């Protein structure tokens, strides 16, 4: 980018969440997680089209911390093998770190159902107790009505999940 040209860039094919805190100093951020390679071929090659949200393949993180200092991160991710034939669905995944963010567990897909739901904009409670509590928006068509592919307006559900922290052990 050229700061003085007044333009901007958007890289929708990027994948991954990074974590950094003040204790890292000048060290690089740590890779947390990204979209899962669901067909285990080493690449994300089954993505037909990414629904436009103004974000990347894995995005919209939200964090919570438990009494032991473990960090939990939820995020929305394109699901490689779950498509309506035009666009891939997004599900909500959660990962955790108990060492200050140096390492992270394998992300767990916490989306109930078959996965053929568009799940976006998760918001996790800041304080995690025996459960991770989060809410997210769900409908059954990838994308949005207000921008991007301009899907038809449909009723969206706001879903609450309470996930036992023992699911991450």
Language model regions located:
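Extracellular, repeat-based ectodomains that mediate carbohydrate processing or recognition
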Residues: 1-169
């Amino acid at each position: 980018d050229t700061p003085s040209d007044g333009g901007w860039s958007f890289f929708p094919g990027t994948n991954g969440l990074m974590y950094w805190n003040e204790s890292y100093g000048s060290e690089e951020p740590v890779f947390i997680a990204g979209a899962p390679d669901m067909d285990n071929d080493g690449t994300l090659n089954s993505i037909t089209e990414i629904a436009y949200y103004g974000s990347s393949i894995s995005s919209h993180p939200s964090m919570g911390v438990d009494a032991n200092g473990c960090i939990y991160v939820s995020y929305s991710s394109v699901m490689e093998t779950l498509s309506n034939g035009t666009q891939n669905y997004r599900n909500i995944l959660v990962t955790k770190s108990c060492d200050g963010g140096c390492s992270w567990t394998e992300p767990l897909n916490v989306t109930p159902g078959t996965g053929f739901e568009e799940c976006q904009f998760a918001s996790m409670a800041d304080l995690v107790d025996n459960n991770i509590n989060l809410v997210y928006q769900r409908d059954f068509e990838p994308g949005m009505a207000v921008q991007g592919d301009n899907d038809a307006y449909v009723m969206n559900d706001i879903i609450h999940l309470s996930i036992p922290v023992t699911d991450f052990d």
